[in-house]
């Protein structure tokens, strides 16, 4: 009798795992297919638009190590600017220097300000950089570009996997978006972490779409 119960539980567990894996796989594939033909590795192939949207990143990881993804996103955004593919860059991220209780966060970062400094160092005119402090999620960055800044088209700058997800979110708002891919980190640990994080983020994307999650913004538009 006990053996029969164990077998039944194992069967149900196996079915649950299979269903979960199928859902995760479907979310991943759907995001990739949707962005097909709209992500670019060659800056010369990127269609010119007025605005670029640089998705939030910090120069330092939560472990206190240098973040290669930050360097590569800044490089990609500067390439777009210097190639005259975008005129303005929205540096969208969050200020993570303090937690919800106001305590200083070890290795915390003011992402928009750090991105601004790095972009200026890369030769981007400071008057062509817009700081967005409400980009604490990709959804918020994309939604604000459309709903607050009033954009109807944008070049998104991040790594390939991130760009594809952001494009799917842009489609929801009728915002025409393409992605310019920053070079991914070559470190094996980063690849594993980013893949796991992206897998969960893509599932969360479709949960947000299903339930109609809508961010609310406090700041007024400040763009050219």
What are these regions (language model features)?
Residues 96-101, 178-181, 200-208, 223-224:
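A general structural signal for short secondary-structure boundary/capping elements
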Residues 52, 213-224:
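Short linear elements at protein peripheries
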Residues 29-195:
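A structural signal for short, hydrophobic/glycine-enriched beta-strand patches
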Residues 3-4, 69, 198:
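General helical secondary-structure elements
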Residues 192-214:
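A transmembrane-helix-recognition feature enriched in membrane-embedded lipid enzymes
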Residues 2-44:
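N-terminal type II signal-anchor transmembrane helix
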């Amino acid at each position: 009798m006990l053996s029969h119960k164990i077998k039944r539980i194992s069967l149900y567990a196996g079915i649950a795992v299979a269903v979960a894996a199928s859902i995760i796989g479907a979310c991943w594939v759907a995001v990739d297919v949707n962005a097909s033909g709209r992500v670019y590795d060659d800056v010369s192939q990127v269609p010119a638009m007025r605005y670029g949207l640089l998705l939030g990143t910090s120069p330092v990881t939560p472990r206190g190590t240098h973040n290669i993804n930050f360097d590569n996103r800044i490089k990609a955004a500067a390439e777009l600017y210097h190639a005259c593919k975008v005129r303005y860059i929205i540096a969208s991220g969050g200020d993570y220097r303090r937690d919800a209780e106001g305590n200083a966060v070890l290795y915390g970062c003011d992402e928009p300000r750090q991105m601004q400094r790095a972009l200026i160092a890369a030769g981007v005119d400071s008057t062509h950089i817009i700081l967005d402090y409400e980009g604490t999620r990709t959804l918020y960055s994309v939604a604000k570009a459309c709903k607050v800044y009033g954009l109807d088209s944008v070049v998104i700058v991040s790594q390939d996997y991130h760009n594809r997800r952001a494009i799917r979110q842009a489609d929801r708002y009728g915002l025409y978006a393409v992605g310019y891919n920053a070079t991914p980190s070559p470190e094996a640990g980063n690849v594993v972490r980013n893949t796991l994080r992206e897998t969960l983020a893509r599932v969360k994307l479709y949960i947000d779409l299903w339930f109609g999650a809508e961010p609310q913004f406090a700041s007024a538009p400040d763009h050219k």
